[in-house]
């Protein structure tokens, strides 16, 4: 993705000569598949945004020493990644992960959340994995998306979800 921010690039190396077993691993994000937190967060935000992929930005405005806004930045679209119906299906599945699955540490809060956990193996011999979570809140009308990776930690539900919860809590607490 062409961004003005510097970040590592995602990659998935597959070709017609890729062995079937490796192709199957790639389909679930294992093997030689590499995705950056930035890229995954953009995809997650597109799901939350009814299928529209937005360009990320870090600062929404700049103020002078008197607190007057001297420059504002606005969200802009890359384009549509999926239909609204496809997005709605993914939102429901991601809500189910919180309500019934591996992101249950986000259940029963003063806001709703939706997301997907992951445990990306990086050492086939030991079975070591990176803990992932990507999601948004509130589930029914998203305002904020987060993507967490804790390298070498293990399960996304055990290690990445609690960090996501702290970020969501901070976001909603500052709004009060």
Question: Which positions does each model-derived feature cover?
Answer:
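Short alpha-helix boundary/capping segments
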Residues: 82, 152-160
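Short amphipathic alpha-helical face segments that pack within enzyme cores
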Residues: 36-42, 159-166
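Short, gly/Ser/Thr-rich active-site loops of penicillin-recognizing serine hydrolases
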Residues: 68-71, 163-176
């Amino acid at each position: 993705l062409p961004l003005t921010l510097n970040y590592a690039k995602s990659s998935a190396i597959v070709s017609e000569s890729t062995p079937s077993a490796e192709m199957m691993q790639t389909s679930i994000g294992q093997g030689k598949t590499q995705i950056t937190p930035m890229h995954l967060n953009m995809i997650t935000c597109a799901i939350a945004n009814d299928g529209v992929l937005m360009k990320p930005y870090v600062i929404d405005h700049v103020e002078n020493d008197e607190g007057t806004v001297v420059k504002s930045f606005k969200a802009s679209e890359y384009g549509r990644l999926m239909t609204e119906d496809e997005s709605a299906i993914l939102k429901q599945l991601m809500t189910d992960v919180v309500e019934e699955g591996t992101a249950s540490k986000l259940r029963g809060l003063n806001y709703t959340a939706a997301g997907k956990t992951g445990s990306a193996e990086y050492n086939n011999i030991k079975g070591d994995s990176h803990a992932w979570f990507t999601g948004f809140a509130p589930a029914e009308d998203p305002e904020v998306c987060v993507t967490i990776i804790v390298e070498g930690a293990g399960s996304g539900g055990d290690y990445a979800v609690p960090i996501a919860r702290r970020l969501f809590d901070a976001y909603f607490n500052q709004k009060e």
